[in-house]
Amino acid sequence: MEGLAIRASRPSVFCSIPGLGGDSHRKPPSDGFLKLPASSIPADSRKLVANSTSFHPISAVNVSAQASLTADFPALSETILKEGRNNGKEKAENIVWHESSICRCDRQQLLQQKGCVVWITGLSGSGKSTVACALSKALFERGKLTYTLDGDNVRHGLNRDLTFKAEHRTENIRRIGEVAKLFADVGVICIASLISPYRRDRDACRSLLPDGDFVEVFMDVPLHVCESRDPKGLYKLARAGKIKGFTGIDDPYEAPVNCEVVLKHTGDDESCSPRQMAENIISYLQNKGYLEG
């Protein structure tokens, strides 16, 4: 027998603790479990508990003597009081940024490239993921280190708790933007490929990085072309009313105004090939010095 788990079931047990508001009598606020090592419980007590149907240990004590707690444990008291007032949702305080002994320029020198974020945005079916893969491969062949954050892939892990509601979409973009920023700081060329329909969300991600390190790539493909491709069958479902809030159908897509690269669909197979589009992005990165240490 390794230990004993005792369940507390909100009994009407009243208690007082010397120095912590002895006159305050309150019920335990919630059910809970108290796990004790078997060695710390006398054999007779273990037998008593095992045979009892009405044993109710105290699960918690609600302390009301804040003055005494504050006097004796000021730091702990402040944390407890803040957590109580804000249900644990208050932004963390008393945190300090720790500088690294290796700076971004050191990592970029090692990799012989400069970190940045290539943010590919456009309608579903515009070819974002395809171009992202082509770009990653082309840069890899040049000896450059990249990492791709695909919108669908990220929702399998980091953002699996998010839906497609407007506020969740904003949080989805925010998280990906923060992760992309970390990759860029390492010196990696981070390729983010996702619809990201709202300008304010894309601009918020841009503001996370130094000027020039956010390269917005707009897949300028007409809706009718994207809908004719419909690789996932989502447009068909949206038209049938089975998907609500689908970008381009019953939710807007806000095209970039001053993006760095526009990949426009012209109908010409050669100029619209994923490889050629990737080369257009690489030309921009090359001209801006991102492919050099």
Swiss-Prot record:
Transmembrane segments: none annotated. GO terms for molecular function: adenylylsulfate kinase activity; ATP binding. The record marks 164 as: Participates in a stacking interaction with the adenine ring of adenylyl-sulfate. Expressed in root vasculature, root tips, leaf epidermal cells and funiculus of developing seeds. GO terms for biological process: cysteine biosynthetic process; hydrogen sulfide biosynthetic process; sulfate assimilation. Keywords: Amino-acid biosynthesis, ATP-binding, Chloroplast, Cysteine biosynthesis, Kinase, Nucleotide-binding, Plastid, Transferase, Transit peptide. Residues 1-59 form a transit peptide. Disruption phenotype: No visible phenotype under normal growth conditions. Apk1 and apk2 double mutant exhibits a semi-dwarf phenotype. It is found in: Plastid, Chloroplast. PANTHER family: ADENYLYL-SULFATE KINASE 2, CHLOROPLASTIC, BIFUNCTIONAL 3'-PHOSPHOADENOSINE 5'-PHOSPHOSULFATE SYNTHASE. Belongs to the APS kinase family. This is Adenylyl-sulfate kinase 2, chloroplastic.
